[in-house]
Curated annotation (Swiss-Prot):
InterPro entries: Asp_de-COase-like_dom_sf, Asp_decarbox
Lineage: Bacteria, Pseudomonadati, Pseudomonadota, Gammaproteobacteria, Lysobacterales
Gene that encodes the chain: panD
Residues the record lists as Pyruvic acid (Ser) modifications: 25
Entry's cofactor comment: Binds 1 pyruvoyl group covalently per subunit.
GO biological process, one term: pantothenate biosynthetic process
Pfam families linked: Asp_decarbox
Residue numbers binding substrate: 57, 73-75
Described purpose of this protein according to its UniProt entry: Catalyzes the pyruvoyl-dependent decarboxylation of aspartate to produce beta-alanine.
Organism whose genome encodes this protein: Stenotrophomonas maltophilia (strain R551-3)
Pathway entry: Cofactor biosynthesis; (R)-pantothenate biosynthesis; beta-alanine from L-aspartate: step 1/1
Self-association state and partner proteins as the record states: Heterooctamer of four alpha and four beta subunits.
HAMAP family the UniProt entry points to: PanD
Official protein name in the record: Aspartate 1-decarboxylase
């Protein structure tokens, strides 16, 4: 059996651009792509913390160090500049692979620069 597990996420990125007439995708600062292991053209899920929208698209590169997180094409209709989003990618793996797998969790500041990374999420308490 194969399981779909969270491979990586960029937590609480700020949308810097929204380009309706650009070819569809999400442009992400290349430093963030490198830190997460998200590949260009890989499917990503976008969860808008600000408005609750959830959708998928694919990643393309933005200039390294720029802090750019730009939603393009139809995806631009789901967000506004300034929205806080989570960008996630999943991977399919066997149960044995899942037993030792650790996701790459990348946390960013208000300028979409890496503040810290982790491979676990704290247990949520009641």
């Amino acid at each position: 059996m194969h399981l779909s597990l969270l491979k990586t996420k960029i937590h609480r990125a700020t949308v810097t651009h929204s380009e309706l007439n650009y070819e569809g995708s999400i442009a992400i600062d290349d430093n963030l792509l490198a830190a997460t292991g998200i590949r260009e053209f890989e499917q990503v899920h976008i969860w808008d913390v600000t408005n609750g929208a959830r959708f998928s698209t694919y990643a393309i590169r933005a200039e390294a160090g720029s802090g750019v997180v730009s939603l393009n094409g139809g995806a631009a209709r789901h967000v506004q500049v300034g929205d806080i989003i989570i960008i996630a990618a999943f991977a399919s793996m066997t149960e044995q692979e899942a037993d030792s797998f650790k996701p790459k969790l990348v946390y960013v500041d208000g300028n979409n620069q890496i503040s810290h990374t982790n491979d676990t999420i704290p247990t949520q308490a009641a």
